[in-house]
Amino acid sequence: EIAITNGDVKKSLKFISSAKKLKTMTLRTDLVKARCEKLEKSYTNAIKIYRDIIQNSAYLITEALPELVDLHKQLTTLEELNDFIKRLSQSNQKLSRDIGYTVIINNINDISSLDDCVNSYIENDSILKEFLDISNDKKDMLKIETISVDKIKRSLYKLARSTSRYQCESCGFSSQKLLWLCPSCKQWETQRPFSNVQFDSILQRVPLISD
């Protein structure tokens, strides 16, 4: 990660190769490999890795999805992204919720399939519905249309920026960024993102996103 941050793709790939030989490959190395492919302009490979991470490792959606969106924007292939997200969200409601949450906290806008996931997130989050005074009656879903979804997204994004987004499953240490080594319990890759935006003392957290 240090190597790729310094723009040394070859050195980063060398470390990844060493990890393969030692059989210590982790999802962390997958993320680094995807970044290397992106910097090397091997966009097809980078997209494949990010898609695999999203499909197989729900807790890293918060890291992989923004990068995937950025790639498709660069390549002007947002329709391909829309098709991919639609297939995922239709086949897995929990994954759709996790995608919606990721879209909110990363302030991703103007992509129809992701907007649908955000709407689904709002409609199916019981705590958020209670906060917005929306009942479980499906007819009351129409109330969401009278509330600016964009305004809700902006408010939740601002709130997410000021609260912890990740928590260690081992000791409970919380942080804004994904930390591979927990500074509290010294365990590797034990942090997971929360699956909803924190409302401080007004609302409570729901469980972490995990595999």
Where are these regions (language model features)?
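Alpha-helical repeat scaffolds
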Residues: 9-20, 43-55, 77-92, 110-125, ...
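Start-of-helix register in tetratricopeptide repeats
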Residues: 1, 11, 27-28, 62-63, ...
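Non-catalytic protein-protein interaction scaffold segments in large eukaryotic complex-forming proteins
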Residues: 57, 65, 71-75
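Cys/His-clustered metal-coordination modules, chiefly Zn-binding fingers
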Residues: 122-211
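Residue at a conserved register position within TPR or TPR-like alpha-solenoid repeats
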Residues: 3, 37, 71-72, 104-108, ...
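Amphipathic alpha-helical elements of HEAT/ARM-like alpha-solenoid repeat scaffolds that form extended
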Residues: 65-69, 98-105, 130-136
